[in-house]
Swiss-Prot record:
A zinc finger (MYND-type) spans 320-357. Keywords: ANK repeat, Cell projection, Cilium, Metal-binding, Repeat, Zinc, Zinc-finger. Residues 374-441 are annotated as: Disordered. The lineage of its organism: Eukaryota, Metazoa, Chordata, Craniata, Vertebrata. It holds the Pfam family zf-MYND. This is Ankyrin repeat and MYND domain-containing protein 2. Its main location: other.
Length: 441
């Protein structure tokens, strides 16, 4: 391989770096076809065109450069940054994923000893951290699609590798979401197929625990997904697909507050069944979950998610009540308290939500009334502060004082009128549309 020196750029290579920032993919493609352009050329800081594209959030440029042979693991930057680090710093989830699929190494460190995931966490790009921590190379799964040793058949049929890889790399571990991913792919909705899938997951789990660099986090994730698969198998027996029944069982809430007890028990059971009792992660999970009464915080799902994906609990973001997808923005139009991804999730959850929707609506209206009352009190306090400041500035008038006779009786009448109007507006808040609908937040 020819050694490329930093800063020694041809005119066309300089133009390429400019086009990456401001130009089009077509212009970049034209320049890359030139003999005077090296796809892995280095600027004065040791940055390749791919690093520039990743840092600037240019997804199509990144794909183009990778197709032309860009080195995703180039380590010539003056501070040891890689293309994956720049992608993570930019906060672009798609580019981070593209870099990982192209073979980006996740354990490489920069000059201050930080990996790409650690750099992303440092600047608050938690979504990128989750993607990096949960990435599982397709090659590791493809290993099981070929007969090994004395085996006559592969442990995993090649046609199942794609759908299974999609589930393995998901960052949403909600049991309903996993069942939905199984249900949406006809290849997985067969008892025999899921039997092979869960056995492969168990093999990967075992390998993660017995390898030299033990990976407890990945092992726990594989075991957890395997347990959900085994639950799905119970609803696929005799050639019948009853996964919708399983989803309803996972969502069904108890009468008092709508908490999904069965879902909580399933997650706790899967953690308890982890076969490696000496694992530090298992002991941490048990210590966090065991003392908590079912229905109280933290839930088993939130503890498990934080342990496996590294998602930060204090980030102000909403999650879908049905499938746990991050960034949900639709609210129930009646109670305004429950959030969904879309109407599909809302309709799926309505069978259990309708039992407590009215109670939640009453709670919401009470909160709104209290919030409006506090706001009105703050405004009144603000007016009083302004009036007292004005009186203090006018010392002679303050000393003389103002008699009740000089005060305007109409002021108190107007104050009462404003108060009545405000109360009427608040009563109007109690009117809400009926029926299971979702509204924008």
């Amino acid at each position: 391989m020819v050694h490329i020196k930093k800063g020694e750029l041809t005119q066309e290579e300089k133009e390429l770096l400019e086009v990456i920032g401001k130009g089009t993919v077509q212009e970049a493609g034209t320049l890359l076809s030139s003999k005077n352009v090296r796809v892995n050329c280095l600027d004065e800081n040791g940055m390749t065109p791919l690093m520039h594209a990743a840092y600037k959030g240019k997804l199509d440029m990144c794909k183009l450069l990778l197709r032309h042979g860009a080195d995703v693991n180039c380590h010539q930057h003056e501070h040891g940054y890689t293309a994956l680090m720049f992608a993570a710093l930019s906060g672009n989830k798609d580019i981070t994923w593209v870099m990982l699929e192209a073979g980006a190494e996740t354990d490489v460190v920069n000059s201050v000893g930080r990996t790409a995931a650690q750099m992303a966490a440092f600047v608050g790009q938690h979504d990128c951290v989750t993607i990096i921590n949960n990435f599982f190379p397709r090659e590791r799964l493809d290993y099981y699609t070929k007969p090994q040793g004395l085996d006559k058949e592969p442990k995993l049929p090649p046609k199942l590798a794609g759908p299974l890889h999609k589930i393995i790399t998901t960052t949403n571990l909600h049991p309903v979401k996993i069942v939905m991913l199984v249900n949406e792919n006809p290849l997985l909705t067969e008892e025999a197929a899921l039997n092979k899938c869960y056995r492969v997951m168990d093999l990967i789990c075992e390998k993660c625990m017995k390898q030299r660099d033990m990976n407890e986090v990945l092992a726990m994730k594989m075991h957890y997904i395997s347990c959900i698969f085994q639950k799905c198998i119970n609803f696929l027996k005799d050639g019948e697909n009853k996964l919708d029944t399983l989803i309803k069982s996972l969502l069904k809430g108890r009468a008092s507050d709508g908490f999904p007890v069965y879902q909580e028990k399933i997650i706790r059971e899967s953690i308890r069944k982890f076969p490696y009792c000496e694992a530090t992660l298992l002991q941490q999970l048990v210590r966090s979950i065991a003392p908590v009464e079912i229905g109280s915080d933290p839930t088993a799902f939130s503890v498990l998610t934080q342990a496996i994906t590294g998602q930060v609990g204090f980030v102000d973001v909403e999650f879908c009540t049905t499938c746990g997808e991050k960034g949900a923005s639709k609210r129930c139009s009646v109670c305004k308290m429950v959030i969904y991804c879309d109407q599909t999730c809302q309709k799926t959850h309505w069978f259990t939500h309708k039992k407590i929707c009215k109670n939640l609506k009453d709670i919401y209206e009470k909160q709104q009334l209290e919030a409006a009352k506090e706001k009105r009190q703050e405004e009144n306090h603000g007016k009083l502060d302004v009036n007292s400041n004005c009186v203090n500035e006018e010392q002679p008038e303050a000393e003389v004082g103002i008699s009740q006779k000089d005060s305007n009786p109409e002021d108190s009448g107007e104050g009462k009128k404003e108060s009545l109007e405000s109360e009427a507006e608040l009563e109007g808040l109690q009117d809400a549309p009926a029926g299971p609908q979702v509204s924008e937040e």
